[in-house]
């Protein structure tokens, strides 16, 4: 088996023009694996730490030279001569070297970039596609599925400079027979939505994740214009296409209340749960992410009891891809799904452990990008290699989003029918 002979870190830019970390892992046979760490805007307070320099004279303090130095110094020294295919040992060694609960010493961005780059190098060394190597690491060799894309076509909240409080309004092509057909459906809806917004005299500028970011009369108005676009594209809402929300409610949780400032409404936890329930009764919304604040577990229990039987309730800021927090949620019957983001936890091994724990408990797992992305498409391979069944990777424009969709098209073609697209059955209800 090949050995690691060099590791290189560098500062590159993400899709928001902010620095992030890229790592190369070089093997003794000349193979190089490269990976970039993404970055979030609406972040959970318990996420692993993204190490930034804080030097206001460079990149407004957002430089990552400290994280890069940790890759080129202590992480490189630690991993030289090790086997890149032993992912668990490699990741655990970095976790031990860091020595903190949230990877604050080395930086989760440094550790993650090396973790993923090593996986890519190991896959190449074994002459395997990355998704196949991930399936092996996951203990499910040769088992794959194509994910249903959750396409974020209207952006609000922290992802846009508009008056829409809810962060993401998504369409899911659940009636498609394949991923490629689903991607086409979503793309057609996206273009019809642009026409609907133009006809209303609304902005068609896009947000961080490529969705349109108009000012709207209410959050529900976003659902109305999307419904119109679905119909104009020739699809049936509720059958061909369903809807999903990412409320990112922690971003508008103030003094124990949920403040939808864009439409001048303030709710208690139970009141906001009822508001969301009402939306699910008026529209075919089958998934809601971060419907309540990450610390409002009592509110989450209310929401789960109200609509959890029929609606996928996804914990993002709530669980932060952390098995300790997820286990607590499972034990308390809070939510029924987890959003999976590599950089919330910081290694591939811990990411796989979170997916496995969720599935064992009957929770779904949704693989996700971050709002600050790069051309790195690893999450596409993760979704297929773990048979997660769902992926969130933004809208149908911006290359940082489309790169993941294009990688999924390549994988589907390569697998040639060996990975099923399960559509509506991936969701509850």
Curated annotation (Swiss-Prot):
Its EC number is 4.2.1.11. One of its GO terms (biological process) is glycolytic process. It comes from the Bacteria. It catalyses: (2R)-2-phosphoglycerate = phosphoenolpyruvate + H2O. One of its GO terms (cellular component) is phosphopyruvate hydratase complex. This is Enolase. PROSITE patterns: ENOLASE. The active site is at 209 (proton donor), 341 (proton acceptor). Binds a second Mg(2+) ion via substrate during catalysis. Keywords: Cytoplasm, Glycolysis, Lyase, Magnesium, Metal-binding, Secreted. The keyword DNA repair does not apply. It comes from Pseudomonas fluorescens (strain Pf0-1). Catalyzes the reversible conversion of 2-phosphoglycerate (2-PG) into phosphoenolpyruvate (PEP). It is essential for the degradation of carbohydrates via glycolysis. Pathway: Carbohydrate degradation; glycolysis; pyruvate from D-glyceraldehyde 3-phosphate: step 4/5. Mg(2+) binds at residues 246, 289, 316.
């Amino acid at each position: 088996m090949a050995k690691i002979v060099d590791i290189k870190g560098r500062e590159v830019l993400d899709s928001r023009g902010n620095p992030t970390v890229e790592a190369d892992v070089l093997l003794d046979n000349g193979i190089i694996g490269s990976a970039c760490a993404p970055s979030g805007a609406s972040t959970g307070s318990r996420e692993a730490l993204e190490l930034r320099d804080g030097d206001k004279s460079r990149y407004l303090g957002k430089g990552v030279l400290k994280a890069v130095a940790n890759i080129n110094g202590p992480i490189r020294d630690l991993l030289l001569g090790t086997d890149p295919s032993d992912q668990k040992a490699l990741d655990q060694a970095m976790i031990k070297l860091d020595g903190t609960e949230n990877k604050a010493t080395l930086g989760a961005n440094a550790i993650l970039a090396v973790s993923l780059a090593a996986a890519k190098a190991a896959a190449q060394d074994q002459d395997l596609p990355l998704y196949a190597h991930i399936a092996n690491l996951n203990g499910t060799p040769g088992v794959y599925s194509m994910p249903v894309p959750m396409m974020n076509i209207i952006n609000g909240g922290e992802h846009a400079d508009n008056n829409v409080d809810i962060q993401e309004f998504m369409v899911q092509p659940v009636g498609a027979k394949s991923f490629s057909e689903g991607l086409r459906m979503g793309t057609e809806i996206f273009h019809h939505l642009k026409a609907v917004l133009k006809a209303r005299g609304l902005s068609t500028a896009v947000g961080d994740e490529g969705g349109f970011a108009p000012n709207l009369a209410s959050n529900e108005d976003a659902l109305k214009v999307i419904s119109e676009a679905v119909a104009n594209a020739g699809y049936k809402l509720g059958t061909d296409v369903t809807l999903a929300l990412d409320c990112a409610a922690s971003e508008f949780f103030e003094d124990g209340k949920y403040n939808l400032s864009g439409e001048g409404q303030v709710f208690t936890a139970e009141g906001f749960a009822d508001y969301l329930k009402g939306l699910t009764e008026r529209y075919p919304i089958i998934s809601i992410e971060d419907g309540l604040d990450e610390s409002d577990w009592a509110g989450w229990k209310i929401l789960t009891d109200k609509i959890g039987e029929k609606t996928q309730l996804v914990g993002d800021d709530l669980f932060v891809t952390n098995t300790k927090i997820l286990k607590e949620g499972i034990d308390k019957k809070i939510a029924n799904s987890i959003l999976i983001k590599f950089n919330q936890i910081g290694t591939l091994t811990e990411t796989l452990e979170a997916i496995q724990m969720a599935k064992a408990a009957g929770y779904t797992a949704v693989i996700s990008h971050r709002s600050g992305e790069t051309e790195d498409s690893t999450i596409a391979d993760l979704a297929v290699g773990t048979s997660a069944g769902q992926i969130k990777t933004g809208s149908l424009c911006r290359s940082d989003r489309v790169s993941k969709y294009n990688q999924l098209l390549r994988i589907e073609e390569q697998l040639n029918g060996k990975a099923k697209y399960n559509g509506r059955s991936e969701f509850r209800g």
